[in-house]
Amino acid sequence: MFSILKRTDHLEESFLKNPNDNLKELENIIIEQEEALRFSSLSYADCYSLGVIVRDLYAKAAYTAPIVIDITLNGHQVFHLAYDGSSPDNDAFIKRKYATVQRFRMSSMRMGLMMAQQGTTMPAKYDVPAEEYGAFGGGFPIKLTSGIQIGVFCISGLRQIQDHCLIARSIAEFLTTKQ
């Protein structure tokens, strides 16, 4: 898990420095995350524990922007936390990220990097409404080790790469301590 965390740090640093550089390398790191950050099983109680982990990591990182955290398992919202200062706009972004992850079975950040590399957008390539789908960081597939997707983990409120990496770090910590 240490290696995936180190790669996550590299991903965040690189993207924050220049979001248009090394898009393929960044996409490959996200693919590694999506393959490594899988669960042997996941219960509703586990989702609560995962939500608490992200809450604690958010506090420890001392971010100043308010966020909304959302974990959906098998189509059922099992964890939702909105910080003071967040707004319904954050929930709208979560819905768009959720739709992207649910339909395309990959993180919304990965979708955004793919679209940037191809010089297109989701509406142009997949004929989906822009107001319903979002190709930006903060939506991550919850998958079992078998590869079956059972849910979606979303964060909205930070810069897109920070939303994405906060999710990855939270799952990595959960897997290290709980499974």
Swiss-Prot record:
Q: What are its GO cellular component terms?
A: cytosol; nucleus; TRC complex
Task: Name the Gene3D superfamilies for this protein.
Answer: Haem-degrading domain
Endpoints of the signal sequence: none
Pfam families, alphabetized: HbpS-like
- Cross-referenced InterPro entries, in alphabetical order? PduO/GlcC-like, PduO/GlcC-like_sf, YBR137W-like
Q: Which GO terms describe its biological process?
A: endoplasmic reticulum membrane organization; post-translational protein targeting to endoplasmic reticulum membrane
Q: Which family would the database say this protein is a member of?
A: Belongs to the UPF0303 family.
Q: PANTHER family recorded for this chain?
A: PTHR28255, UPF0303 PROTEIN YBR137W
Protein name listed in UniProt: UPF0303 protein P4H10.12
Q: Which organism is it from?
A: Schizosaccharomyces pombe (strain 972 / ATCC 24843) (Fission yeast)
